[in-house]
Amino acid sequence: MPSKNSIQGSKTVDRVSIEAPGLSPQSNHNSSSDDEQDEQDDISQSDSDSDSDSDSLDSQASRKRRKTSQEPTQKDIPLIATTSVPSRVKAKSQKNSLDAKNVSNGATLAPTDAQTTFAALNVKPWLVGSLGSMAIKRPTGIQKGCIPEILKGRDCIGGSRTGSGKTVAFAVPILQKWAEDPFGIFALVLTPTRELALQIYEQFKAISSPQSLKAVLITGGSDMRPQATALAQRPHIVIATPGRLADHIRTSGEDTIGALRRVRMVVLDEADRLLASGSVGSMLPDVEECLSILPPPAKRQTLLFTATVTPEVRALKDMPRTPGKLPVFVCEVDTQALAIPPSLNQMHLQVPVTHREHYLHMFLLTEKNLPKSIVIFCNRTATADYLTHLLRLLDHRVTALHSKLPQRQRIDNLGRFRASAARILVATDVAARGLDIPEVGLVINYDIPRDPDDYIHRVGRTARAGRKGEAVSFVGQRDVQLIQAIENRVGRQMEAWAEDGVNLETRVIRESLKLVGEKKREAMLEIEEGREVGGKRKRGMKKLS
C-alpha cells in the first residue's frame, strides 16, 4: 500500500507538471502573507534534544513541532547515494548503519571545463559583458549544463550544491529570452524566504543592468497595496514568496493579477522546500495557489532548482509530456558525493549541555577565530534571540536573523553583517538556504539540525565559490546519533576541533564561568522585560512592576 506521503507527492507532481488549475480542495487552508519558510524555522525537536537542555529560556518557551522536510518511509527513500563512514564522535557502537549505495538515476552531469565561456553557451554578448562586469567570467558546472538547454525551451530540473551559481543558471536564459520579447509579466520566480527573494531580485537587477528591466519583489512583511499597484503595472519579472503572492491571488482583482496568466517562464528556487508535503507548515498549498493562475505547463517553461534533489522533485521528470514538447532536462552536479564543498573543513566540539554558552564565548575568542566572520545556527528563534542578547552583553559585535524580527530589521541586520559592522550573525535556518554572504570564514552549529540536508544548507554558507571555510558543530551527549546521520549523508567524517596552544576547557574554567553566568541572567532579564538587543525597550512593552 502506498504511503500517505507518496500519495501527496504524486499530487505535487500533478500541480507542477500537468494541470495547475485542477487543484485539490484547500478550503481549510488559511495562509497569511507571512506563511513562508522564514515564519516556520522552529525545527521539529524531540524532547531528548540537547536544545531543550541548553538554557532555561528555551525550556520555558513554547515549543512548535514543525518539520522542515518530509520523513520518508522505506518506499520513499530519496535516490541519493550515501556513504557509511566511521564517526570520530565517541558513542556506543551501533549495529545498524547505512550501507554505501550508489544509485544511478540517469541525471546529466555537466562536465567541468576551465576553457568554457558563456559565449560558447550561446549567451548573448550583452549578457556576457554584464556577467564579466560582475567578475563572473566562466560558467560553473550547473550553469554550463542548464543554460543551453533552457535556451532551447526545455523544462529543467537543476540540482547542485550550495554556492554553485544556480541563480545565474536560470537568470541568464530568462533575461536572454525576455530581451527577445520584453512583455510583462514574462517570468515568475518563487522562493521560500524573504531574504533569498531579495537576493535573487538584486541579482536580476545587476545582470540586466544594460537593459531596462522592470522587476518587482513580492514578499511578506511589507504593505500589500504598493505591491498590488506594482503587479498591476505588469513588470517584466516577479520574484515572490508563495505565501504573499497567494494572498494577492486570493484578494486582489483581475487588474492586479491578470498579467500572471501570460507568464512564459516560472522558476521554483529551493524546489525541495517549496514542494515538500505532509508536514505542518508546508508551503505546497500556497505554491499550488500560485501555479493555478499561471498558464498550463504545456504553455510555459518550468525550471526547478535545488541543492537537495528530493523524490518529489525527481518524480517530475517522469511525468507524461505534451506532444511536441521537449522532454524535461535533468542536470545534477555535485549533489551526491560532493554535497559538501571539498574546501570545507568539518569539525565537532564536544561540550556539556549545561555550559554551552561558556564554551561558545571562549571559542569565539580564540586566536584563530577572533578575526573571522561567523554565522551561528540555532534550531529555535528563542535560542537565537537569547544568544544575541548574551553575546552582545559579552561585548561581541553580533546581530541576528530569524523570523520573529520585523522585516525592516532583518534586512538591516543582514546588511550590517555583510558590511562587517557585525562580526557574528546568530540565525535560524531562515539564513541557511541560498543566501550568499561573502567571506564567511566559520559556521557554528550551536544546535545540531535533525535533518542532515539542513546541515548541508547551513555549512554551505561558508567555503563558497572555491574559497576555504570551516564548520564546527557543538555536540552534546544526546547529539551523537544526529552527527552520525550527518556523516553518513555527506560521506565524510568530522574531525575533533583543536587549535594549537588552546585548551578550551581550561579557559572556560578560568575565565568565563562567573562572567557568562552573570551575563546569562542579564540577558534573560532583558528578554523578560521585552528589551531589544542593546537594552532599549520594545515599542508597546510596559515596564514590569
Curated annotation (Swiss-Prot):
Domain Helicase ATP-binding, residue spans: 147-327
Feature: compositional bias, Acidic residues? 33-56
- Please list the residue ranges annotated as the Helicase C-terminal domain: 359-510
- GO BP of this protein: rRNA processing
Q: What is its main location?
A: nucleus
| A Pfam family that the UniProt record links to this protein | DEAD
Which residue ranges are recorded for the region named Disordered? 1-98
What are the alphabetically sorted keywords of the record? ATP-binding, Helicase, Hydrolase, Nucleotide-binding, Nucleus, Ribosome biogenesis, RNA-binding, rRNA processing
Residue positions of motif Q motif: 116-144
UniProt lists compositionally biased (Polar residues) regions at 1-11
Q: Record's InterPro entries?
A: DEAD/DEAH_box_helicase_dom, DEAD_box_RNA_helicase, Helicase_ATP-bd, Helicase_C-like, P-loop_NTPase, RNA-helicase_DEAD-box_CS, RNA_helicase_DEAD_Q_motif
Q: Which intervals of this chain are the motif DEAD box?
A: 269-272
Q: Subcellular location, in the record's words?
A: Nucleus, Nucleolus
The family database entries (PROSITE patterns) matched by this protein are listed as: DEAD_ATP_HELICASE (PS00039), HELICASE_ATP_BIND_1 (PS51192), HELICASE_CTER (PS51194), Q_MOTIF (PS51195)
Q: Tell me the residue numbers annotated for binding ATP.
A: 160-167
Q: What is its EC number?
A: 3.6.4.13
Q: Which GO terms describe its molecular function?
A: ATP binding; ATP hydrolysis activity; RNA binding; RNA helicase activity
Any GO CC annotation of this UniProt entry: cytosol
Q: Which reaction does it catalyse?
A: ATP + H2O = ADP + phosphate + H(+)
Q: Does the keyword Nucleus apply?
A: yes
**UniProt record similarity statement:** Belongs to the DEAD box helicase family. DDX49/DBP8 subfamily.
Print the domain comment field: The Q motif is unique to and characteristic of the DEAD box family of RNA helicases and controls ATP binding and hydrolysis.
According to its UniProt entry, the function of this protein is described as: ATP-binding RNA helicase involved in 40S ribosomal subunit biogenesis and is required for the normal formation of 18S rRNAs through pre-rRNA processing at A0, A1 and A2 sites. Required for vegetative growth.
* Record protein name field: ATP-dependent RNA helicase dbp8
Q: Which organism is it from?
A: Botryotinia fuckeliana (strain B05.10) (Noble rot fungus)
